[in-house]
Amino acid sequence: MNIQVLEELRNSMEGIVQKSRKRTYTNAKRLRRLNERKLIPKVNDFMKYMRKQLQRGLTRVKARKPETFAEQLARWDAIIEEGKRILKPELLKILAEGGKAVVERKVIKQEAEPRFDMLGVPAVKWAEKHTAQLVTEVIEETKQAIREQVKAGIDYGKSIQKIAKELRPIVGLTSRQAGAVAKYRSLLEEQALPEQKISSLVERYANRLHRFRTQMIARTETASALSEGTLQGFEQIGIKRVQGVADEEACEYCLENIDGKIFTLDEAHGVIPAHPNCECVFVAAS
């Protein structure tokens, strides 16, 4: 076999591999969108529950000290437990979808019964740990936003009752989002609009940011669960190494640190998603 034939064969094999990876990426992206739509209502349920508890606390603020305002606003431990109750089952289902997508493709070729164990120790352990981390992170971001808005209100000379009233539409947002709402309120107040009109516009803007935050959390956590499920699926069928695949238009970080890079399974855990809008996936390394 001469060099030209070998080169043609090599190019042909590379083309087949590239097509296979592109197909895998497209299928993974479709699976991610499907499961993201399923997770959004659950994230929304948790966020609405947290907002309801916080807004209830805002009706009882007279005796609250500014420095402990956020901590005393609600029973945060109860919110954490409710968040875990709502989110853990759905994240476990999404993890299973990622695992099944790998295992079923492999086992079908062997003409055996495809099965991914979603109730196995690794899957359940990940879901428990990750859900607790997620809920805690969301709560800490929410607390920090409240602290910053309380401090800003006091620095501006507002009463604690006035601060509580302005907090109502923004509890549950991140610091940046809450700051954007506060800035929007200030701009409206400069226009000397009626208070009722200002409150209506602020609430509409805040609700848009609440929806955005819910969608962003759902997108990120769907990617996390599917990625973990994919890795656990690879482990079940004996794959030892994986390769990262990024879209051609992915961000610089993903192109430099994930796309084409080879990882052991241990190294790959937690790599994807690299950021909230990350759409990278793992394929079995050749």
Locate each region found by the language model:
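Acidic, glycine-rich two-metal-ion catalytic cores of nucleic acid-processing enzymes
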Residues: 196, 201-286
